[in-house]
Amino acid sequence: MVGLSRLAGGGLLLLLLLALLPLALDGKPAPLPQALPEALAGGTTALRRDVTEEQQQQLVAEESSGPAAGRSDPKIGDGCFGLPLDHIGSVSGLGCNRPVQNRPKQIPGGS
């Protein structure tokens, strides 16, 4: 048997709460849960709007356009990795594996 000192801590309060809980409900049973709405026959695809022919053409045009659309050469212009170089990169040649055409000649001993 559990001692009274142990029940006096938190156990007595729990027993009192459990004993008074039916009185708080006024003897009424808990309400039954409502039924969930039934799903549509087509699932989530039935919720989609119909796409018009014009919208479909726009989607196809957006998918076919982009940064690489219509290119046959991987590089464009004088840039590296298909991107144009800034002034510093074009002078120093950093990031490119080819010689720079308009590189200024360095003067030995100059600052």
From Swiss-Prot:
Tissues where the protein occurs: Expressed by the venom gland.
A Gene Ontology molecular function term of the record: toxin activity
Keyword annotations: Disulfide bond, Hypotensive agent, Secreted, Signal, Toxin, Vasoactive, Vasodilator
PROSITE patterns on file: NATRIURETIC_PEPTIDE
Disulfide partners: C80-C96
Region (Disordered): 51-77, 92-111
Signal peptide, first to last residue: 1-27
One GO CC term on file: extracellular region
Main location: secreted
Pfam families found in the cross-reference section: ANP
Localization of this protein: Secreted
Gene Ontology terms describing biological process: regulation of blood pressure; vasodilation
Propeptide positions: 28-71, 107-111
Family indicated by similarity: Belongs to the natriuretic peptide family.
Known function: Snake venom natriuretic peptide that exhibits vasoactive and probable hypotensive activity. Is only weakly active on natriuretic peptide receptor-C (NPR3).
Further details from the record: Negative results: does not activate natriuretic peptide receptor 1 (NPR1).
Protein's name according to its UniProt entry: Natriuretic peptide TNP-b
Phylogenetic placement of the source organism: Eukaryota, Metazoa, Chordata, Craniata, Vertebrata
